[in-house]
């Protein structure tokens, strides 16, 4: 019960945050669904068109400036926080429409700007400690945990881990048996 009332939301406000925020939240992104197709040449064309349109539309797009926060979209939040986020649907749709990667910003921004939920954050300084996910980006994109990683998983203070693969059924069975 030591974590009761905590919001496990990863917050990233590091050095690259300001640049990333300006790029993703203040510009207008129109063709994002077409930037990751199976045709590589088409991706490059749509990225260039999107950048051009974004720069042309910049003087006409008036996005409210706010205190943004960014983080992983894996969260565990209280029911009260979830109800608050859902109640902000109209604001989220109007402010985050035609932005890039809004799933990394909208919930974190709502929590960051709400005094009660911000105070309940498990960690304001470490994105993955904050969401209590054990995710290894240094060895993979993300790294896939295997049976060889049992000790690391066992000694982690995190509540969840990502990512596993059905190709290694032993680790999945071990996780179920050990933590259920």
Stretches found by the model and what they are:
Residues 1-180:
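ER/Golgi luminal nucleotide-sugar-dependent glycosyltransferases, focusing on the catalytic module
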């Amino acid at each position: 019960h030591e974590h009761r009332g905590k919001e496990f939301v990863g917050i990233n406000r590091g050095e690259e945050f300001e640049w990333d925020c300006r790029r993703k939240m203040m510009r207008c992104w129109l063709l994002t669904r077409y930037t990751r197709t199976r045709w590589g040449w088409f991706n490059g064309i749509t990225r260039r068109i999107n950048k051009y349109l974004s720069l042309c539309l910049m003087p006409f797009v008036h996005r409210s400036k706010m205190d943004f926060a960014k983080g992983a979209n894996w969260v565990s939040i209280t029911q009260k926080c979830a109800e608050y986020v859902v109640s902000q649907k109209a604001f989220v749709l109007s402010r985050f429409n035609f932005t890039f990667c809004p799933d990394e910003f909208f919930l974190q921004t709502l929590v960051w700007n709400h005094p009660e939920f911000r105070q309940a954050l498990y960690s304001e300084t470490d994105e993955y400690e904050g969401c209590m996910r054990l995710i290894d980006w240094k060895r993979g994109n993300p790294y896939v945990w295997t049976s060889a990683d049992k000790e690391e998983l066992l000694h982690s203070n995190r509540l969840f881990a990502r990512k596993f693969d059905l190709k290694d059924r032993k680790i999945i069975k071990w996780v179920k048996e050990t933590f259920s």
